[in-house]
Amino acid sequence: MLSSGSLAVSTIGHGLALARGLTTKHAIKQVDRLLSNEGIDIDAALRHWVPYVVGPRTSINVAMDWTEFDADGQATLMLSLLTRHGRATPLLWLTVDTATLKNCRNEYEYQALVRLADALPADIKVCIVADRGFGDHKLYHVLTEELKFDYVIRFRGNIQVTAADGEMRTAAAWVGRGGRARVLRDALVTAERYQVGSVLCVQDKAMKQAWCLATSSTQASAKTLICLYGKRWSIECGFRDTKDLRFGMGMGSIHVSTPTRRDRLWLLNAFAIMLLTLLGAAGEALGYDRYLKSNTTKRRTHSLFRQGCMLYDLIPNMPDGRLLPLIERFAAMLAELPVFADTFGVV
């Protein structure tokens, strides 16, 4: 898949044949059988995958979002680890038939969250970050009371919010003068008056609409909440890397017959993202990122994943003076994979 740069079965097969010297026809069949192999239990794989990705972290922020594949009538619920390198790392996912969402969406979200809680190492603090599609007081209750997760979830601006002193307004009406942030501690939300830790309402000049965020925290500052919710966008960038035919690996443009096959394809995608991110981290540690950008800024221009993709394409003709240190650094990271503790700290 790394050789092909695509998630299409035939293209992965071509890449496998190229990398291993196989017959293209037989390589494509191997990939097809892999995706249909019932012996590959995604739930079992994710129980190992989640602790590996989390690594030595004691607290994590997890973005949750749906992405749809209209041509196949499927949708995937993705939970991704928010990182510092520009891309959210796939952590856990569940693909279902879109036709079942109307009556079962909450059940699917609950199922995925429970699977995450079961797979995580003990004593890991989790904060779920999600957009307006998840702004439901029932979900808030499940997260805090049952799963013991924190949350920062956006909700619609027309939802009623009651301040601690009893004053009630729509969420958008709580935005401060000039769009300034206003934090309401121990606020009540919705007509059911469900109590949350805090509500943040803000509309920066660059925002098309106000951000109305509900959080379980009673102490987080407005700046902290805004920065955390802003990182949620990295899951959208991850979807583009996976789905887009031009800028990514094209999953959104290929036909996948069943949700189970798509979940196995997501697993291959997660492995590819992990390896390419590690390659990008190895290159950046050696200062190779300055060869990949046209500007002279010292800050990171490309995500580690994008750096890994670019370096992988350059490897066949890379001079030995640059190639050998890169391979050695990458191999050193791979050597840590049995324990994963430090390796996945960067992923």
Question: Which functions belong to the PLM regions below?
Answer:
Residues 16-30:
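Short, basic interhelical loop/turn and adjoining N-cap
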Residues 1-8, 46-47, 58, 71, ...:
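Single, function-defining residue in the core of a domain
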Residues 27-86, 90-92, 97:
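Active-site-proximal, Lys/Arg-enriched surface segment
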Residues 2, 18, 37:
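Nucleic-acid substrate recognition interfaces
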